[in-house]
């Protein structure tokens, strides 16, 4: 009985020590890095939009919004995506983006433009 109790305590100690170690392998994205990534993706979306590849640009704008939705660039990305889809005749995609903009950014200064589109 005594040896079983010692064995049980030993395994509990091993379990506790294995759980208490810091995991240094985790990669943590800082706010600055995430915002820089978001701006870079937004710029890629602008470049693709200027080249005429509206579908890929729309995907890049959506990716930019998902990366950092609190940024001032996020609502702009949604509007650019909707505008690109609208100009190329992809009205369903444009309406989806505009509805998402109207729900997420109710008090944005460019809300009138979203209603106009």
Identify the residue ranges that each predicted region occupies:
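Bacterial Sec signal peptide processing site at the extreme N-terminus
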Residues: 17-37
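Short solvent-exposed coil/turn linkers within tandem alpha-helical repeat scaffolds
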Residues: 67-74, 102-112
